[in-house]
Amino acid sequence: VLCVGGWLLPLGQEDSLADVVATYRRLPAVAFQTVPVDAQPITVRTAVTGGRTYVYLVNDSPWQTEVSLAMSTPATCPVQDVAGRRSFAEVENAGPAASWRVELKPWDLVAVSLPGESASVRDVRVALPNDAREELAARLDRLQVRAMALAQQPPLDALDNPDFELPANTDGSIAGWESDARGGAELNVDPMTPDERNQVVRLHSAGGTGTVLRSAPLNVPDTGRLGVWVWLRSTQAAAEPQVRIALEARDRGRVFYRYATVGHGESVVRVGPGWQQFFAQFDDLPLSGLDDLRVRFELRGPGEVWLDDVALYSLNFAEPERVELFKIITSAQLKLQNGAWSDCLRLLDSYWPRYLEAHVELSAAQLAERTAQRPRPAAPAAPPAEADRGGVLRKIQSWLPSRFFR
């Protein structure tokens, strides 16, 4: 089944797809066999039926390609387009050492029929434009720079008072933040570093109800991700409070609520007497229909906790995630070296590379630096030896922090 954005042909593109669709419809309804030759981005399949041999070629790439087939054919071998829409060159030297040349447009499908049932394809040679490899190498460069840039993403400028240094409102409430009716959220000078420029928030509750501090509404990030960093400490080691780092919003009128727990409880990180940075990652934010998004900190039950310096990140990737990204890059690099054009392109067009292209901006300086580091690519030779494969892996490894490989 062929589907392009739905069950019907895309409106306005019928002319560009007419040859492909007509060819597909006229293929005989029999099983075709793939010619066992790696000639990416071209796939060649053949079938014999009704006293004729059918050959079709698919160009799985955005480049115009020239294909040469080494064949065995009858002595007289006219080439017929199965759709009757296009004219092709004749077979050269028809017979046991015949050859046939054909040019395929980007994403093209060509199918022809040959007389008799004895014709066969022995080999496939593909010639791509000179800039095809350069184009793939450039995309790989940009992907590498984007992946490395994930470790240096700045926090979002989304909170009005992330470090709590703004003066309190006239009613004593915390600027840029809201507490619930139970109270229990107040500004204090950090007693561990008494400095009037180092204000922190003290959340406290004497009863069992706890308290909540929430931010003003935020713009919903278009990445579908939001990481919350915050510094916490508690002086109550004997009765350590439980704290939730949470997001709240309305998702098409329904409550949206996600949280991570620290402090008291099993399998959670403890909140000690010294300042410690905590992190909660939320990866399932809806890309539409979400509004009134807020960060919230909940003191669950009685106790006391101090918090400071809240930071939000929309592109925070954990180390295991970055390692997986570099595995994709490594694989694409090896595919490119081996001339596996379609495999390389398929990796570059997969979800996470496309995601980084959409959300990680690159400066001209970053691109220029990476381009200057890359040698001009040569044409692919024979498959590299194992030592060469290790060289690529060592190169990728050198881009990652050493802690990835302990």
Predicted region positions:
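Aromatic/acidic polysaccharide-binding cleft in carbohydrate-active enzymes
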Residues: 1-26
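Beta-strand-rich binding/interaction modules
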Residues: 64-90, 241-245
